[in-house]
Amino acid sequence: MPVDIGKLVTPVDSAHPGSAILVEPADAVPFERSWADQRHWQQRLLEQPHLPEAVWLLQHKACYTLGRGASSEHLHFPLDQPPAPVHRIDRGGEVTHHLPGQLVAYPVLDLRRRQPDLHWYLRELEQVLIDVLAQLDLRGERLPGLTGLWLDNRKVAAIGVGCRRWITQHGLALNIDCELAGFDQVTPCGLSGRAVGRLVDWIPGLRLAEVQPLLRDALAARFHLAWCDEA
C-alpha cells in the first residue's frame, strides 16, 4: 500500500545520505493505518537500501498498544470491553496509551547508516526529547534503568521501538495537552506508582502545534536528516 505522504516540507536532493520523507497528517490517525505505513516503508528499505528514510509526526485517535510480551495484567479493564481499541504490536515495552494532544514520532531509520545498536538508539531518542524540552525552558530527566523522559518525577514521554535488520519502526510519544484520564485505565509502561504528566501542566496554554516543529527539528539534527520528496 502506498505511504500517505501528507504534508511535506521543501524538497531537497533525495540522493543525500540523510534524506528522509516527512509525513505530518493534519488529522488524528488510526493506529492501524500508521503501523501499516511504517511496515510498508521498512520493507521498502529492506528491499531497496538506497531509498530515503521516513519520519511520521502525528496524533492518534484514542487507543492502547501492548509491546511484545507485554502483560495484560497492566490493563485495568476486560479485554472484551475496552474503553478504546487495543493493539498488540511488534515493539518493546509494556502498555502505552495514545490519544489526541499527544505528539507521536515514528522514525523508520536504517541504523546501519549511523550505529547499529538499539541501546544507543533509545538513548538518542531520549536526547531528542531532552532537546525539545530545553527549547521550552524545561529540564527533561532520564531515570536510571528506565526508558522515557520525566519532569519532576512525572513521565511525560514514552519510548518503544521495533527493529528488523537494523531498520526501525515505532518510536516516541510526548504528552502535550492531552487528557490524562485514559492513563488511569492502565499501568503505563508497566511502571506501578509512577505518575504521568503533560507539558501543559508546566506551560499552561501550550499547544501541540507549537511543539511539533521543535520535535521535527530535533529529530533532523540528532539523526542528520534532510527532508525530501518520496523516491
Swiss-Prot record:
Keyword line: Acyltransferase, Cytoplasm, Transferase
GO molecular function: lipoyl(octanoyl) transferase activity
EC code(s) of this entry: 2.3.1.181
Pfam families: LplA-B_cat (PF21948)
PROSITE patterns: BPL_LPL_CATALYTIC (PS51733), LIPB (PS01313)
PANTHER family: LIPOYLTRANSFERASE 2, MITOCHONDRIAL-RELATED, OCTANOYLTRANSFERASE
NCBIfam families per record: lipB
Anything else known: In the reaction, the free carboxyl group of octanoic acid is attached via an amide linkage to the epsilon-amino group of a specific lysine residue of lipoyl domains of lipoate-dependent enzymes.
The protein, known as: Octanoyltransferase
Taxonomic lineage from the root: Bacteria, Bacillati, Cyanobacteriota, Cyanophyceae, Synechococcales
Gene designation: lipB
